[in-house]
Design a protein with these regions (language model features):
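Terminal and domain-boundary regions
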Residues: 4, 29, 83-87
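Recognition helix of helix-turn-helix/homeodomain-like DNA-binding domains
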Residues: 25-42, 46
Length: 98
């Protein structure tokens, strides 16, 4: 699963624009756009900014592993956002899920 789509899902779940998220994480808007469109991979330093930021820590485990640990406060964005972005597929349509 592409990190860019996951970061976009996090941004949408948090009701942030690209400029707002880029400012929070302290990366350029261009870097964020390219990442969300999977044109480029984030450097480790930038990726760590997402996992350490207080607003996005709850997504850190999911961002890195595709799994959640709700009992530890580690969640994924709302399923409808993931479905809309193609991160998961609706298994009621006969397609397999991610």
């Amino acid at each position: 699963m592409e990190i860019g789509k996951k970061i976009k899902a996090m941004r949408i779940a948090e009701n942030l624009s690209q400029p707002q998220m880029a400012q929070l994480i302290d990366i350029s808007i261009g870097t964020l756009r390219n990442c969300e469109q999977d044109r480029t991979e984030l450097k480790t330093e930038s990726l760590m900014k997402f996992t350490k930021h207080k607003r996005f820590k709850k997504y850190a485990y999911w961002l890195m592993t595709d799994e959640t640990l709700p009992e530890s406060g580690q969640i994924s964005p709302d399923f409808s956002i993931l479905l809309e972005l193609g991160i998961v597929e609706d298994d009621t349509s006969g397609k397999k899920t991610a």
